[in-house]
Structures are given as structure tokens and as C-alpha cells.
Design a protein with these regions (language model features):
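Short regulatory alpha-helical segment in sensory/regulatory domains of signaling proteins that mediates
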Residues: 18-22, 34-43, 49-51, 76, ...
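GAF sensory/regulatory domain recognition
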Residues: 36, 48-87, 109-110, 116, ...
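Signal-transducing coupling segments at domain and membrane junctions
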Residues: 105-132, 155-162
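Amphipathic alpha-helical "output/dimerization" segments
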Residues: 144, 159-184
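Signal-transmission linkers at sensory-effector interfaces
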Residues: 1-33, 40-41, 59-61, 182-185
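Soluble sensory domains of the PAS superfamily and closely related sensory modules
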Residues: 93-102, 108-112
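A short, aliphatic-rich beta-strand micro-motif
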Residues: 131-140
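Flexible loop/coil segments at beta-strand boundaries within sensory signal-transduction domains
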Residues: 139-145, 154, 186
Length: 186
């Protein structure tokens, strides 16, 4: 019974969010808000939104609760604006290239035969450990890919990293639609 109560509470939050989302006019604030909300709903530690610019993916929005807690007052997260090509080599690039979502249980154990790889350098640079990843393309109604939503490290009730569930995927897909609608306005 507790799961259905939790599910109902989450649905109420989603509906409330959807009712208030269009009051936000600033695209940057809106996308940051969407990213923050989906991370809360699926209990994910981190996430990013990438936007397509000149055949590359550019990270525009990044959030990471673990790293945020470790910052000294006045410090900012160590993310720099960076871009990489849309191709099959990276996880986000693969999703933008193929238009298909990817759900990865352990970023460090991706089978060798797959074309995409996890870039461990980001974890090394930021002293973080990425494990579970849910990456979904952001598409316009005509099918054009305009970005990628990536949610990282789903957490269980004890704060341990877990795989993303089917239910998480439903919520992430819903919020990806919100991102698409926001990007459509730009």
C-alpha cells in the first residue's frame, strides 16, 4: 500500500508542476527548474541538459547534489561549458545520434562491443562516481533532435545508488516532454 501512496504523491507533484510550469518565462530558469524537479521525483543525485549547437552537444545545465554538498561557501560546481560531437562514441552523443534513449546500470561496466563509452575523465576531474545513467533525446514534433536530458545516479531510500526503474523512466519521459516544449519556444 505504501508504494501506491508514494506513487499518488508523486503524481500529485507532477500535476502541480505541470500546472505551474508555464508561469516561468525565462528559458534558463525553466530548464533548471525542470531538471531539478525530475531529479527530486526519481531521487537522482545529478543530471544535465545538453543542447544541440552546430552539430555538437553543449552542456547547458548541470546539477549534482553530492558535489554541491562538498563545496566551500562561495564555490561553484567545477563544470565548464564543453561540447562534443553528435556521434556514437559517447553516451549522450549516441542518444542524440540515434534518437533512442539509453538506460545504463553501471557506467563503468558497459560491454566492449557497444559503440558508446563512458568518459571517466569527468568523474576523475570532479572526484565523482557515476554509476546509473538514464539518457533520453529531446525531440521536436518533426523528429529533429534539439538536445539530450541525462539523469545520473538514482538513489534508494538509504542514499545508495540504484538502477533506474521502469517507473523512473515514465517520469523522466514526461519531464523530457517539458524540456522539449521549453526548447521549442527558443
Amino acid at each position: 500500500m505504501e508504494k501506491s501512496v508514494n506513487h499518488n504523491e508523486v503524481l500529485e507533484k507532477v500535476v502541480e508542476f505541470d500546472q505551474n510550469i508555464y508561469d516561468i518565462q525565462d528559458i534558463d530558469i525553466l530548464l533548471e527548474h525542470i531538471l531539478s524537479e525530475i531529479r527530486k521525483i526519481v531521487k537522482a543525485d545529478a543530471g544535465s541538459i545538453y543542447v544541440v549547437e552546430d552539430k555538437n552537444l553543449v552542456i547547458k545545465y548541470a546539477q549534482n547534489d553530492t558535489q554541491l554538498r562538498e563545496l566551500q561557501p562561495g564555490e561553484k560546481l567545477p563544470y565548464k561549458s564543453f561540447s562534443f560531437p553528435i556521434n556514437e562514441k559517447s553516451i549522450a552523443g549516441y542518444v542524440a545520434y540515434t534518437g533512442k534513449p539509453l538506460v545504463i546500470d553501471d557506467a563503468y561496466n558497459i560491454p566492449e562491443e557497444l559503440p558508446y563509452k563512458f568518459n571517466k575523465q569527468t568523474d576523475l576531474t570532479t572526484n565523482y562516481r557515476t554509476k546509473s545513467i538514464y539518457t533520453i533525446p529531446l525531440k521536436m514534433p518533426d523528429g529533429k533532435i534539439v538536445g539530450v536530458l541525462q539523469i545520473i545516479n538514482a538513489l534508494d531510500e538509504n542514499g545508495k545508488i540504484r538502477s533506474f526503474s521502469i517507473q523512473d523512466g515514465i517520469y523522466i519521459n514526461h519531464f523530457a516532454t517539458n524540456c522539449e516544449q521549453a526548447l521549442k519556444q527558443t
